[in-house]
């Protein structure tokens, strides 16, 4: 099966520029994990045995799962000039001389999706972090009889109008499904907030 990956590469004049880039990308991944995916991570440097083959330094973000195992959620590598020399990648500097650039590479994979599921899921389904949820709020009107439908739907629309500028709201007014079916369906989909 295909392993999906978001990856980037840069080349720099100086080692310091490459170091700054590699650390900045790690910070971006940590920011996403913590502030969008809602998962705390630890930023660190991999040991010589764990670093990316050919890298000078490998940085990573790691998250602790419910089973007390760590999951590597993203990496960023300082490659030095190792790959530019191996593949004869050069640039012409300001003195018109050929130089080998200092490179970086960085990436996250579908493992990050697994991290979100492992961190926020439970035995009933997925619980998406609000910033990632396609629908942040689902409103499920419970209409006991046709005579109440108009007033209940007016209330549902008032709720929607009051929150739709701040949240992504879905009104589940499907008449052919029971409230219990809808509750279960939206719980499985991981909607953070359900209003009945």
Q: Could you describe each region identified by the protein language model?
A:
Residues 1-196:
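NTP/phosphate- and nucleic-acid-binding module
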């Amino acid at each position: 099966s295909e392993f999906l990956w978001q990856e980037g590469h840069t080349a720099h004049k100086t080692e310091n520029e490459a170091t700054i880039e590699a650390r900045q990308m790690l910070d971006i991944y940590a920011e996403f994990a913590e502030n969008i995916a809602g998962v705390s991570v630890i930023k660190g440097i991999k040991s010589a045995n764990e670093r990316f083959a050919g890298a000078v330094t490998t940085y990573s973000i790691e998250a602790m799962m419910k089973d007390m195992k760590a999951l590597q959620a993203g990496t960023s590598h300082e490659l030095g000039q190792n790959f530019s020399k191996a593949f004869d990648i050069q640039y012409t500097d300001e003195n018109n001389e050929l130089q080998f650039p200092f490179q970086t590479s960085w990436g996250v994979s579908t493992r990050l999706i697994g991290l979100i599921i492992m961190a926020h899921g439970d035995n009933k389904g997925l619980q998406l972090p609000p910033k990632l949820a396609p629908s942040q709020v689902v409103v499920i009107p419970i209409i006991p009889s046709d005579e109440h439908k108009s007033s209940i739907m007016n209330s549902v629309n008032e709720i929607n109008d009051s929150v739709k500028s701040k949240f992504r709201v879905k009104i589940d007014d499907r008449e052919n499904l029971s409230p219990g079916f809808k509750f279960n369906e939206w719980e499985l989909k991981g909607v953070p907030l359900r209003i009945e």
